[in-house]
Amino acid sequence: MAKRLDLKDVNIYYGAFHAVADVSLAVQPRSVTAFIGPSGCGKSTVLRTLNRMHEVIPGARVEGSVLLDGEDIYGPGVDPVGVRKTIGMVFQRPNPFPTMSIRDNVVAGLKLQGVRNKKTLDEVAERSLRGANLWNEVKDRLDKPGGGLSGGQQQRLCIARAIAVQPDVLLMDEPCSALDPISTLAIEDLIATLKLDYTIVIVTHNMQQAARVSDQTAFFNLEATGKPGRLIEIDDTEKIFSNPRQKATEDYISGRFG
């Protein structure tokens, strides 16, 4: 299920603006990679190129290669919708369909694919909610609106929705930034479990979170305002936080800037 991601000489543009320059990195299957860096450095932009989500912005384009187990997701004839099924996304703020039931929130993607068998949908809903560590909290109110859950529960519901379509990769764009510490801990524990089955890439501004949940960390930075963001360093998380190779990395994680 989990697959490897490789970026090779990736440059990202929005119209004439060069947003991110010359990114090359590898993300191993069944691991967590954290993207860190100051605001505006391009880390979320890079994350969104991993499933072509940035293409919803007019004028966006990518040069270079983004490979999923060796297959270029930007290759000729590759369907972006299929890419987004294979590489799921969990956003910064929980975004369940507020009036849709908890069950229907989870299986919304399957219904869009034409799955109508109730037994199948119920089985997927339970499996996905269990996978998101939410089943025991909602099993007696599956027909209640998803918008009635707490913030942390809503984010786990969104994770259940993402894994219901059985992706190979999960992208998480600051999934805990809108949550309280207890809900954040629940999401972090869930990430540790999910990486047994999925390749995970997470963007976070929280240095402690990156250190806790990730196997490797990539640090992005800007040379100056108006210049493209760049990958400064990527390494095992322990090395990034204890003995980074680049001074800019050390300055950022020690709080000297950012």
From Swiss-Prot:
Gene: pstB
Function: Part of the ABC transporter complex PstSACB involved in phosphate import. Responsible for energy coupling to the transport system.
Localization terms from the record: Cell membrane
Enzyme class: translocase
Entry keywords, A to Z: ATP-binding, Cell membrane, Membrane, Nucleotide-binding, Phosphate transport, Translocase, Transport
Entry-linked PANTHER family: ABC TRANSPORTER I FAMILY MEMBER 17 (PTHR43423:SF1)
Record's GO cellular component terms: plasma membrane
Domain (ABC transporter) ranges: 5-247
Binding-site residues, ATP: G37, P38, S39, G40, C41, G42, K43, S44
Topology in membrane: Peripheral membrane protein
Matching InterPro entries: AAA+_ATPase, ABC_transporter-like_ATP-bd, ABC_transporter-like_CS, P-loop_NTPase, PstB-like
Family that this chain belongs to: Belongs to the ABC transporter superfamily. Phosphate importer (TC 3.A.1.7) family.
SMART domains: AAA
Family matches, as Gene3D superfamilies: P-loop containing nucleotide triphosphate hydrolases
GO biological process, alphabetically ordered: phosphate ion transmembrane transport
Catalysed transformations (reactions): phosphate(out) + ATP + H2O = ADP + 2 phosphate(in) + H(+)
Protein name: Phosphate import ATP-binding protein PstB
Cited PROSITE patterns: ABC_TRANSPORTER_1, ABC_TRANSPORTER_2, PSTB
Name of a matching Pfam family: ABC_tran
GO molecular function terms listed in the Swiss-Prot or TrEMBL record: ATP binding; ATP hydrolysis activity; ATPase-coupled phosphate ion transmembrane transporter activity
The protein's Enzyme Commission number: 7.3.2.1
Claim: Lipid biosynthesis is one of the keywords in the record: no
Complex formation: The complex is composed of two ATP-binding proteins (PstB), two transmembrane proteins (PstC and PstA) and a solute-binding protein (PstS).
